[in-house]
Every structure is written in structure tokens, then in C-alpha cells.
Amino acid sequence: PAGLVLSRETGFSRTYGSNPYVGYDDVNNPPFLYDGPETPGQLPAVAHVLAVDINDDPVAYPLDMLSEMHVVNDKVGDQDIVILWKSGTASALDASSIAEGKDVGAAIAYSSLVDGKYLTFKFDGLRFLDDQTGSIWNVLGRATDGDLVGRQLEEIVSVNHLWFSWAVFKPETRVYQP
């Protein structure tokens, strides 16, 4: 209700919904116009990552890895978390029309603590479920069916970045390995 709507009347002649940097996130190319320090070579510079930093323990979760796993249960900064990934989000930096960009998906980090108990999660090919109750969860962290229906996971501050744009500020970042 308090959201703002973007206007197509920007005062510039650039077409709304178009990408002036086609192929910017092609992992075979260096970042266009980036003139900063080298980033750690753990990932291609323009790999899409979800970055989490809890208690000075930065971790990057590559979206291409998340697209295969859908769920990651992890511990960051002594806090148990879960990362949920869902397809359906286009890269704004791939094709000339943003809507036609490759599907990089969307990932969100949550605390896995619910009602004083830590849950672990899995993806069954269609849905997110917790191992403890079998409740079904959506990518927004809400239980939609089962014993925990209506419960909401607490979102953890996380940011979708290209690897170089995160690692330049947090070079000590651990890249998640399954």
C-alpha cells in the first residue's frame, strides 16, 4: 500500500525496459567500465551471487549453483540460515529487452529459527518443505500448508550482486561450497 510506482516519464529518451549494457553479465567478459582492484578469482567477476554478512562472516552464494539446489541450509556468523531460490527472474543485464534476459532466478536468505526450533529445508522438485514437520513454504518464507501454516521466516539481510561488486568491498568473502 505504501509502495511507489516508477514512471515511464523519466525525462530521458532511453526506452523504458531496455538494457544499454547488453551482455554485461556474460561470465566470459570482464566488467564493463570497472577500473577497481582485482577481485578474488573464486568466481567469474560478473557471476550473480546472493551475499550475506552476519557478524563479520561474509558468504556469497552463486545463483547458478542455487539454481541447481534451490535450497541451502547453512550457518553464517553462528546463525542457522536457509537460502531459498526460485526461477522466474530475468537478468537486467543480459538481453537488449530486460524482459527477455536469461532467467537468473531470485534468492532470499532467512533465519531457520521458527517458534524456538531450528528447521532444515529441502526442495522436492516442486515445493520447499521443512524436514521437521513437512510443512510447505513459498519463496517468500511463508508456510502455506502443514503444521506451520501461516508462520513467516525472518528475513536475513542479503543482497543480490555481481561477484566483483561485492568482493571488492569484502575480499575475505567465503564462496559457499555444497
Give the location of each predicted region.
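Mid-to-C-terminal functional-domain signal that highlights helix-capping/loop sites
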Residues: P1-P178
